[in-house]
From Swiss-Prot:
Its main location: secreted. Most, if not all, of the six potential sites for N-glycosylation carry carbohydrate moieties of 8-10 sugar residues. InterPro entries: Olfac-like_dom, Olfactomedin-like_domain. PROSITE patterns: OLF. This is Olfactomedin. It is found in: Secreted, Extracellular space. Expressed exclusively in olfactory neuroepithelium. Residues 1-16 form the signal peptide. May influence the maintenance, growth, or differentiation of chemosensory cilia on the apical dendrites of olfactory neurons. Major component of the extracellular matrix of the olfactory neuroepithelium. It comes from Aquarana catesbeiana. Oligomer; disulfide-linked.
Amino acid sequence: MYICLLTLVLIHAAAAFVAQNATGILAGKDHCVCEVLLPDSSFPAKRVGALEDETIRLSNRVEDEMQKLEEQDIILDTYSEKIINLTRRVEYLEKLHPESLVEISFEVLKREIRELEMYISAMRVKPNGNSVQVETLYNEVKNMSKTVGQLETLDKNNVLQAKREIVNLKKRLVDCEKNLKAKPSLMVPLGSCQHQGLAHISKPNLMQLNWKGNAYKSGAWGKDAAWNTTKKSLYWVAPLNTDGRVLESIRIYPSMSDLQMYKNPIDLPLSMLIKNKLNNTFAGQGAGVVVHNNNLYYNCFNSHDMCRASLTSGVYQKKPLLNALFNNRFSYAGTMFQDMDFSSDEKGLWVIFTTEKSAGKIVVGKVNVATFTVDNIWITTQNKSDASNAFMICGVLYVTRSLGPKMEEVFYMFDTKTGKEGHLSIMMEKMAEKVHSLSYNSNDRKLYMFSEGYLLHYDIALKP
């Protein structure tokens, strides 16, 4: 028995020399014979090649995924900065209503929106009912879906607003379905004054803090309130200075989404810097502000003049409101310098004020926008200083008063068409004690309130 050293050479690009000891027999004087059994004489070159190709493919995929991860890191950094910048807004809301801030599941939120879309889509094909109302709800749900998509990576404040809007839409859908079953529909069409007046005011819907911050308590906000305006999607916010008197500028947003995200703002200055000195010739005074047909109407600073500023051309005008009292002579209870309060409704533009002759009683004036003058006035029996605010619907004045830090009451009305007045009691919840401004918009039938720096709105119902 002898030990033989065998050297096998495997012919392949990936092979090497292999040495192995084996038992053999001596054949002759210088030959050692060993028996070697190889299971397969051919090397699997094709399989190795395929493995190499697969390795290259996987390597490329790993590189692609790494690139995607880097891009995601950049996106996450961007949104992290946005969240940090929006933290202040959440903190303000936590101070106001901490019990309302809860974790919201976006998946649940989006699922509810999809259900609403399906529900309204089914209602759109029904032959009866009020198609205008259905289309309005359909468009609002579509807008809400878009807004939730934008808010998913942003602050909780707007998520809660979206949740509240969905709850509100669900309630309106129930009412809408009831209207569909009713023949004929009892819904009062938008723009119509064929009704019996104000019937109900919804709970408050919180939009957000004004763009200047929590220190700016007084101001006004809303949409273009002229009936059937071409600027229905435009929003404006007008916080007064911290003194609660001077309005130096307003901010305009092209859409609700822009307003909620504080995006794409357009600032309209009312105070002018002339020779390094602030000129308040066209500055505003008080929060009795409204936008009507793309024009801002307000009380000129330190005067009984009415001011008008075009939101597009920046042209400023002023006209005296004869005999009107000003400079906080007769403002609303709880808010300063709102001696002159502009309001818009289905009938046009109005101004609410007082005169020496009226002895502090509310006077309603109809504004002729063509001549920028007040053509007709009505003197009521209601003291302005006993009211917290007022608004117009279809030529009828509605006056509110405070019943405490959380409740407001619409308690007085005056019809300019008939000259008749009356008392009523329609409750209106509020989130803070002071109502700094309150205005009506006939295009969406909402009330817009500015209260302690926050923007709120209410849905209203009219008696058919």
